[in-house]
Curated annotation (Swiss-Prot):
Job of this protein: RNA chaperone that binds small regulatory RNA (sRNAs) and mRNAs to facilitate mRNA translational regulation in response to envelope stress, environmental stress and changes in metabolite concentrations. Also binds with high specificity to tRNAs.
Gene3D superfamilies: 2.30.30.100
Annotated keywords: RNA-binding, Stress response
Residue stretches making up the Sm domain: 9-69
Quaternary structure and interacting proteins, as annotated: Homohexamer.
GO BP term, example: regulation of translation, ncRNA-mediated
Any GO MF annotation of the entry: RNA binding
Name of the protein in its database record: RNA-binding protein Hfq
Source superkingdom: Bacteria
Cellular component GO terms held in the UniProt record: cytosol
Species, as recorded: Exiguobacterium sibiricum (strain DSM 17290 / CCUG 55495 / CIP 109462 / JCM 13490 / 255-15)
Record family assignment: Belongs to the Hfq family.
Protein's gene: hfq
Length: 83
């Protein structure tokens, strides 16, 4: 059986683990820049200039990382053949 991935959680977790500088665009148009420190189903903690901000996800429009994030590890040869 194929595993189901939650892209949002995987993406945010990679940003957090790799300490990728990220711009968070809010639906109001305001921009916040910093590092993702933690997240859950409803909030994201962003650290910028030594200060933390708790941002509600419903207020976020876009995450724009400073560099690309690898979303999935390469599949094994066996998985590719069975498709």
């Amino acid at each position: 059986m194929k595993a189901t991935y939650n892209i949002q959680d995987y993406f945010l977790n990679q940003l957090r683990k790799d300490s990728v500088p990220t711009t968070v665009f809010l639906i109001s148009g305001y921009q916040l820049r910093g590092l993702i420190k933690s997240f859950d189903n409803f909030t994201v903690i962003l650290e910028s200039e030594g200060k933390q901000q708790l941002i509600y996800k419903h207020a976020i429009s876009t995450f724009a990382p400073a560099r690309n994030v690898t979303l999935y590890e390469q599949e094994t040869e066996t998985e590719e053949v069975t498709r």
